């Protein structure tokens, strides 16, 4: 029981959330989506008046796939992104590491992410008052391909809402 609690606590901290998000960004859209501090699929649906049916139809066209569920959508996104990465790098591997975690005020997080926060407030009624803590986590992603290596540094803004940490926004730090 104690081991389970330790594992759960170590996965629900800003560094872990940011690292898992950056890794999932390249490899697993379902996981990346689950790590946002808000309902990211609601943002996706906001352009379609909340209609999953219209969204899935549009995504079926965009990805040339039969998409009728979120799992179908995640698979199509992952497949498309993997194909793009393979075209650019050949066989590749993605690794991530956290290089810095800095506590910041909620006010600073909201200021730094102001454009995105306004969209969230407008489109999904995101309540910034529910944020109780904030950090900015710098993570490095490395794509090692057959012929080249690409490195990217990303500042991930992670906020605490209702006891859980989630991604508010990310900004390239290169």
Protein language model annotation of sequence segments:
Residues 14-18, 137, 167:
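Hydrophobic aliphatic residue packing
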Residues 13, 33, 153:
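Amphipathic alpha-helical recognition patches that constitute DNA-binding helices
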Residues 51-148:
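Surface-exposed, charged secondary-structure patches
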Residues 29-36:
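Solenoid-repeat scaffolds in large eukaryotic assemblies
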Residues 147-174:
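Short beta-strand edge/turn micro-motifs at domain boundaries
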Residues 1-27, 39-58:
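Short, low-complexity N-terminal intrinsically disordered segments enriched in polar/charged residues
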């Amino acid at each position: 029981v104690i081991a389970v609690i330790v594992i759960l606590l170590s996965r629900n901290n800003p560094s872990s959330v940011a690292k898992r998000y950056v890794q999932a960004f390249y490899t697993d859209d379902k996981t990346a989506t689950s790590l946002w501090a808000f309902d990211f699929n609601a943002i996706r649906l906001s352009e379609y008046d909340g209609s999953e049916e219209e969204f899935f139809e549009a995504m079926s066209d965009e990805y040339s796939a039969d998409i009728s569920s979120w799992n179908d959508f995640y698979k199509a996104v992952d497949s498309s992104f993997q194909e793009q990465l393979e075209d650019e790098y050949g066989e590749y591997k993605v690794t991530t590491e956290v290089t810095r975690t800095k506590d910041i005020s909620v006010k600073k997080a909201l200021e730094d992410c102001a454009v995105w926060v306004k969209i969230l407030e407008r489109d999904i009624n995101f309540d910034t008052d529910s944020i109780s803590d904030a950090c900015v986590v710098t993570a490095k992603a490395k794509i090692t391909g057959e012929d080249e290596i690409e490195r990217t540094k990303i500042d991930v803004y992670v906020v605490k809402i209702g006891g859980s940490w989630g991604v508010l926004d990310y900004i390239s730090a290169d």
